[in-house]
Each structure stands twice: as C-alpha cells, then as structure tokens.
From Swiss-Prot:
A single GO BP: translation
Native organism: Hydrogenobaculum sp. (strain Y04AAS1)
Function in brief: Binds the lower part of the 30S subunit head. Binds mRNA in the 70S ribosome, positioning it for translation.
GO cellular component: cytosolic small ribosomal subunit
Record InterPro entries: KH_dom, KH_dom-like_a/b, KH_dom_type_2, KH_sf_prok-type, Ribosomal_S3_C_sf, Ribosomal_uS3_bac-typ, Ribosomal_uS3_C, Ribosomal_uS3_CS
Full protein name: Small ribosomal subunit protein uS3
Amino acid sequence: MGQKTHPIGFRIGVTKDWLSKWCTSKKEYPNTLHEDIVIRKYIKERYKSAGISKVTIERSGEKIRVRILSSKPGIIIGRKGAEVDQLKNDLERIVKNKDISLSVDEVRVPQLDAQLVAEDIALQIERRVSHRRAMKRAIDNAIKSGAKGIKVQVKGRIGGADLARAEWFLVGRMPLQTLRADIDYGYATAYTKYGILGIKVWIYKGDILKGGKEEIMKKIEEDLVSQAKEV
C-alpha cells in the first residue's frame, strides 16, 4: 500500500516553519517537550469554541512566548483583556517560575485553514449531519474563498456500518510532492455512538516559491546556514 508523507513535516524549512522554537540540553529535552504538549492541550481544551488553529511556542532562557491563532480571538482575549491575563497566570502556574508572554492573532479566512475545516466537519458529524453534506459544504466554502484545491477524507465506521471504510472528495489540484506548493493540513476526530471517525483535510493555496528546483535548494541551504549560526 502507498504511504503518504506528512505534508507539513515534508515542507519544514522550505515553506513551513516549526510550531516550537527552542534549543535545550539532552537532559532537559523531555521536560521541555512535555511542557509544550501540556500548554497546547490546556489552551485547546479551555477554548474549544474559539476555533484555535495553531499554538506556536518560542523559548529564550526562562521566557516563553506563546502565540495563539484563532478564528474567534475575542473569546480568548475577553473583556478588556481580562481573560487573556487570567490565561497567562494559569499557564505560569503550570510551567512554574517561567515568564510567559501571550499574543492572540486572528485567522482571517477560516475556510482556508485545514485544521479549522477538519474540526468543523467533525463537529457537524457529531451533531448527526450527513458526512457527505459536511464534506461538500467545506469544499464549496474553501473554493469560494480562493483555494486552488482541497481534499477531504473521512475514515471509520461511517453511518454505523459494520466495516470501517474511507470516503474522500478532491476538487482542484493537490500537488503533494511539490515542495514550493503551499499545502495546509489538518486532522480532527469525531466521536459518534458507533465509534471514532478520523477527518483529514488538505488545502492547496498556490505556490509560495515561484522558481524551480535551484531556487528551492538555495532557500534550504540559506535556512540551514542561519540555523547553524543560531546554534
């Protein structure tokens, strides 16, 4: 069977960036990584209705910069910033003795954010909307918002069937093996009374690097040199 590489990991250093940016010793690495996982899980569970797409974390010494990308930033910020201040205090209690700075940015076009699209489809399926209707609605909204291509897959015991299967729709182009292609990817889980359904979404927004192979290799080399200097 043909296996697919992760579209985000495949493009890191070319058109995509890391969600966590920090360097640490081998001894501290597990604890630091676990802190990142706890921070992301806490924020996502606390603001389930805020439409959180990504949580990026940067570390410098004892300072942690957390950036939240959300389709509804007002829920996280709160009235006069009261909610975001409370979140900052709660996170500082979790990580212990570290200074946290928070920033909340808006996802301008949620119809083109693969993670938000996947979570919206999962929510509709949990509310007993037909999976095909939810998939086609997401595809129509993405194409109308300017996507060059979109692929949506639902996998599991669809409709309570005895055997698990996968259904997918593809509209437009999806050049998964082209490094310069700006492809966003998201995954969500729908919990139904028959079991768990997995939803995957790929959205192609066009090319970021207009040049050919030479320009892409030059960009990779420049990134490697800059990373070596930082270390």
